[in-house]
From Swiss-Prot:
Highest taxon, organism lineage: Bacteria
The protein's annotated pathway: Quinol/quinone metabolism; 1,4-dihydroxy-2-naphthoate biosynthesis; 1,4-dihydroxy-2-naphthoate from chorismate: step 3/7; Quinol/quinone metabolism; menaquinone biosynthesis
HAMAP family from the UniProt entry: MenH (MF_01660)
Protein's gene: menH
Name this protein carries in UniProt: 2-succinyl-6-hydroxy-2,4-cyclohexadiene-1-carboxylate synthase
Amino acid sequence: MILNGKTRAGKPGFPWLVFLHGFSGDSREWQDVGAQLPDYPQLHLDLPGHGDSANIAVAGFDEVSQLLADTLVSYNILKFWLVGYSLGGRIAMFHACQHPAGLIGLIVEGGHPGLHDEPTRKARAESDAQWAERFRREPLENVFSAWYQQPVFAALQETERDALVALRSQNNGAALGAMLQATSLAQQPDLRAALRAHDYPFHYVYGEHDDKFGAIATELTAQRHVIPNAGHNAHRENPAAVAACLAQILRLRIKDIP
């Protein structure tokens, strides 16, 4: 079994960019950014429970990571950068910590490396279980209206929030609920130590108004990049700036590729 996705052709010899979306997104999420990086072949994936992979269920991070590995093999992707946002960033970090063959670098936007202590982990598990139940039982428009009122999304304008609610409500609620619990931050190991031992370029991107993940960025041994005029969803709020940031990162590294 492999994940569904969409490819974009690039120039021969350039490494692949493998894009992973956030919770309730799909393979379209990074398309505006990817369109501004035409030299690079790209794979935009639908994660389990999302988009055309909505019928794929996983039990946890190990299974997602194996699915990702199998998918890359199926596309014969031998050298690649992982680029992930939020949930996709957490999956990207977890996968990178498994030392996959062919990984050139890691770019994470607003992804959490993991929780430190058991009380926080328990509280998060309870919160995610409640959200998952809502996704399974309530109209998605109602759930996402509440979801985007969370403090991390405070920088969103009302029109942006309404657009996201309408877009995300096209999902399958049961599939989202299952994926939310399977990949809950409560289930994710604390990846800080493993990420400190990385032997690949690690870049962390966040919006200037995203105070929570700006603080998290300081805890990581990653090169930090602040996106102006953006909050937690920087690649949607300011795609041109995120694309320019990625282009700069990739230009600096392309000369190092054998």
